[in-house]
């Protein structure tokens, strides 16, 4: 009992030392939960949707029957993701190497391109209908993928060079691995399993944003 009380007291003290920026890091977890709930439950409003074969973006296509439910369930995702990412950029100022900071800045830029690009240009139909809107959706995806890869590689390099930030690099490696599995898997596996490997890619970025948020929460505030 005494040991438990000491642990609780230390937790209380640590929580009191946190500032507003630290707590904003927890929004990364909120974003991950919001996105996960949307991915899991939106198919309930999409008759015939096969999550193993279809992409997540089909759920938010302009004519998808699940669009309304998707928007409701993912309402916290975009705003929490962007607030968390911007706060991480602010919190990393003066910390770590220039490579680490550049990687985080590019990752945040990717989040903005994702939020704005996919909101402005959702798929016009499930799959790919070939319209201008669909082409812009694909271009947004390409930019998001390139920024994701470059940013994660930079963070991995920074983590290798600086042991203090090796957790950033380790989780960036996991996220990059998930993206590569998704990218290569979509061209290798049968169409019946396209949705399975595609989810590795989409959850890699969302998950890593949550990791950055947790790391921000753990950072000791400057006096």
Per-segment meaning from a language model:
Residues 23-28, 96-110, 166-172:
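Interfacial segments of alpha-helical transmembrane regions
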Residues 59-79:
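Interfacial helix-start motif at the membrane-water boundary
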Residues 72-84, 143-155, 203-217:
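Hydrophobic cores of alpha-helical transmembrane segments in multi-pass inner/ER membrane proteins
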Residues 33-50:
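Alpha-helical transmembrane segments of multi-pass membrane proteins
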Residues 76-103, 152-160:
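Internal transmembrane alpha-helix with an interfacial aromatic "cap," most often the third helix
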Residues 114-157:
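Membrane-proximal helix-loop-helix units in multi-pass membrane proteins
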């Amino acid at each position: 009992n005494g040991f438990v009380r000491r642990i609780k007291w230390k937790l209380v003290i640590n929580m009191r030392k946190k500032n507003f920026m630290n707590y904003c890091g927890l929004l990364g977890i909120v974003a991950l939960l919001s996105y996960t709930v949307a991915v899991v439950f939106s198919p309930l409003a999409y008759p015939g949707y096969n999550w193993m074969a279809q992409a997540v973006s089909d759920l938010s296509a302009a004519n998808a029957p699940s669009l309304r439910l998707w928007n409701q369930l993912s309402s916290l995702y975009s705003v929490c993701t962007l607030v968390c990412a911007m706060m991480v950029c602010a919190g990393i100022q003066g910390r770590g190497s220039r490579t680490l900071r550049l990687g985080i800045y590019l990752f945040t830029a990717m989040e903005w391109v994702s939020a704005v690009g996919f909101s402005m240009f959702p798929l016009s139909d499930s799959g790919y209908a070939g319209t201008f809107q669909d082409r812009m959706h694909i271009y947004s995806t390409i930019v998001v993928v390139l920024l994701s890869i470059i940013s994660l590689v930079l963070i991995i390099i920074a983590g290798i060079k600086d042991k203090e930030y090796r957790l950033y690099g380790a989780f960036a490696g996991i996220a990059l691995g998930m993206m590569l599995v998704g990218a290569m898997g979509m061209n290798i596996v049968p169409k019946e399993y396209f949705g399975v490997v595609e989810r590795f890619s989409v959850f890699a970025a969302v998950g890593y944003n949550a990791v950055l948020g947790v790391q921000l929460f753990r950072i000791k505030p400057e006096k």
